[in-house]
Amino acid sequence: MLNKQNKLYLQAQAYWDFLRIEKQVSPHTLTNYQRQLLAISEMLIAAQIDDWQAVDASVVRWILTQSHKQGLGAKSIGLRLVVLRQWFAYLVQRHYVKVNPAVGIKAPKVARHLPKNIDAERMGQLLDVEVDEPADIRDLAMMELMYSSGLRLAELQRLDLGDMDLIDAEVRLLGKGNKERIVPIGSRALTALQAWLTVRPSFNPQDNALFLNKRGGRLSHRSIQLAMQKWGERQGLATRLHPHKLRHSFATHLLEASTDLRAVQELLGHSSLSTTQIYTHLDFQHLAKIYDASHPRARRKRED
């Protein structure tokens, strides 16, 4: 690997501040962009291209071809193209280059492999567990909330206490692109969250993060993944339990029971459906009605 102190990579230093401050990308996204642009700059330096102004569409295609030869899959090559496109958009904006050479170049198609969902009966066995240890109470609350409301891992990880409305059984989420949405919380998840909030002070909280590690700080993405993996192993789950499997199961179970596809899609926070939502606006009351009628662990309303 070439030293990071190469001319091409050094030119991107101000770009990292732009992404972090103006675009407010997550640390994970920033690290990915840095890793990709470093790999690209090393590839160009090795080809004796030492100025971004020398990169045209043919060079971009060469980068993608070389990436394939290095063993990168379609998804990774697609990410590399996205990084290039965004980087050159920044350079155009700063008047360093006149055109974006990555525009119009298509990424390789990625075969979509959705994780297998856990059926509703097995999900019940996974979550209907008596817990006493504070860490287990926390982990159960995380899983109930993810399955109850279809959260992404990043959405769960960044939750603060103020994002929860336990009276109205709602949670405010900040999704991809900093897009906010409000989703309902099912009764089982609500009970699990209340149990967690009872023992949360024993973790000596250092901030307002909803889910804490043993030092009182916010749980990391990796810690959440490991906690769920260990939970699945303890409950005898045949396949690895990871956060997205809970989100996928949430979507699958709702779609199996509901005839309103758009409601489920809005609950998931899929930005790609914005065009459809122009024609059919779904308010929260409607989403909550679909949720209550469809989710196997919802039943938020008490029967008098």
UniProtKB/Swiss-Prot annotation:
Keywords: Cell cycle, Cell division, Chromosome partition, Cytoplasm, DNA integration, DNA recombination, DNA-binding. It comes from the Bacteria. Pfam families: Phage_int_SAM_1, Phage_integrase. Residues 113-292 form the Tyr recombinase domain. The active site is at 152, 176, 244, 247, 270, 279 (o-(3'-phospho-dna)-tyrosine intermediate). Residues 6-92 form the Core-binding (CB) domain. CDD domains: INT_XerDC_C. GO terms for biological process: cell division; chromosome segregation; DNA transposition. This is Tyrosine recombinase XerC. It comes from Haemophilus ducreyi (strain 35000HP / ATCC 700724). The lineage of its organism: Bacteria, Pseudomonadati, Pseudomonadota, Gammaproteobacteria, Pasteurellales.
